[in-house]
Design a protein with these regions (language model features):
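C-terminal all-alpha effector/ligand-binding and dimerization domain
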Residues: 1-111
Length: 111
């Protein structure tokens, strides 16, 4: 499955998420079930999946392409954070892969 989600804050797009889910783990995945809720809670509760500590994410920055700018309601060339995540189960099997395009002017990351 390749679900896409657009997360809004006060009806303004903040994050455009593209996810790959293996169908063998999520045979009846319902994108509507996560429309207004947590993706992680849904897969944990519905499929009893656990994310391994070895999972990893990287953050990079790019300039918004015309298509990305349209989706996130930005100007072309505005800064966009890219969060790439590779999540796996404790036994090392791929759980999901995602790429999130985050409007740089509308989001803060804290560590």
């Amino acid at each position: 499955f390749f679900p896409e989600r657009l997360l809004l804050a006060d009806l303004i797009p903040v994050i455009d998420i593209h996810t790959w889910l293996p169908t063998r783990l999520f045979p009846d995945f319902d994108p509507n079930a996560v429309e207004n809720g947590s993706f992680f809670e849904y897969i944990k509760n519905t499929y009893c999946c656990t994310i391994a500590e070895s999972s990893r994410s990287t953050i990079s920055v790019t300039a918004a392409s015309p298509d990305m700018a349209k989706t996130l309601r930005l100007s072309s060339g505005d800064p966009v954070l890219i969060l790439d995540s590779y999540m796996e189960t404790p036994d090392g099997s791929p759980l999901y892969i995602s790429r999130e395009y985050i409007a740089g002017s509308r989001y803060t990351i804290s560590f």
